[in-house]
Amino acid sequence: MVKRLVVTAGEPAGIGPDLVLALSKEHWPHQLVVCADKKMLAQRAEQLGINVTLLDYDASTAPSPQQAGTLVVEHIDMPSTCVAGQLNEENGHYVLKTLERAALGCMKSEFDAIVTGPVHKGVINRAGVAFSGHTEFFAELSNTPLVVMMLATEGLRVALVTTHIPLAYVSKAVTAERLLKIIDILHRDLVEKFAIAEPKIYVCGLNPHAGEDGCLGREEIETITPTLEKIRQEKGIHLLGPLPADTIFNEKYLNDADAVLGMYHDQVLPVLKYKGFGQSVNITLGLPFIRTSVDHGTALDLAGTGQADTGSFRTALQHAIELVEKKQ
């Protein structure tokens, strides 16, 4: 059965529109609906020398496979002009409107998944909206109390206990209650969305050497280890850890792990991006819909040049398609 996926172009001054337009160069097995300003897409296509027919989205028609040379567009009006590579805070609210339209469409079952292009957090905040990222935005919009940020590439999935918070706040944020909820969401989605019957989750410690028996920090002794043991006993989830972050990515562990759970953003993401930058995908777990995204930023210096690497965007779309098809 043909599905309908919605794609957001992200920050209009960045490479998001370039990545979206690149999708028009080939056939796709499902319908792709792009949430963006149609005029902006037409201008960027001309700048890039891409010959594409932009079709108006009609929700009343049945989805059909995406044909090369076309893009279906759900027009969201952009209030100010856009020049590739030049941020304009007057368009900050426009970016949020594209995200809102896509998410609400998924929540109404109009769309089967969201694939998001890169946004610029700074320009949205300068537009007067407190915005820390897609993950938190979609969680608030869908009234989801807690979501889990996962990134994946070939041979590695990593998830986070904390996401976009200052490093100084991480220790207090890693609580038994949060660990219980994060691991529950991670395990459930590995089973339900990734079709892994009995997931094996490897868990990082917080401190260097996972605390070195309390000599380098007591969070492992007081919080992480007892919480993992409680989950093992009560839920039977296969957990290994806490392990030192500088050894958990050893091949002997990764060959067995279905996911690695890190305590904070820069503990695990540098490893994943080194392993698969440009070929990795951001997946939000715990939402009432499927959402994937690129693993990189807006790359303003590449916008409109034709030099943007489409690898991560294609990977995000392919992962979304795989997850949608597993639901069938």
From Swiss-Prot:
Recorded catalytic activity of this chain's protein: 4-(phosphooxy)-L-threonine + NAD(+) = 3-amino-2-oxopropyl phosphate + CO2 + NADH
Primary residence: cytoplasm
Entry annotated with the keyword Lyase: no
Record flagged with keyword Cytoplasm: yes
One GO CC term on file: cytoplasm
Transmembrane segments: none
Pfam families assigned to the protein according to its UniProt record, in alphabetical order: PdxA
InterPro entries linked to this entry: PdxA, PdxA_fam
Record keywords, A-Z: Cobalt, Cytoplasm, Magnesium, Metal-binding, NAD, NADP, Oxidoreductase, Pyridoxine biosynthesis, Zinc
NCBIfam families associated with the record: pdxA (TIGR00557)
Function: Catalyzes the NAD(P)-dependent oxidation of 4-(phosphooxy)-L-threonine (HTP) into 2-amino-3-oxo-4-(phosphooxy)butyric acid which spontaneously decarboxylates to form 3-amino-2-oxopropyl phosphate (AHAP).
Note: The active site is located at the dimer interface.
Name of the protein: 4-hydroxythreonine-4-phosphate dehydrogenase
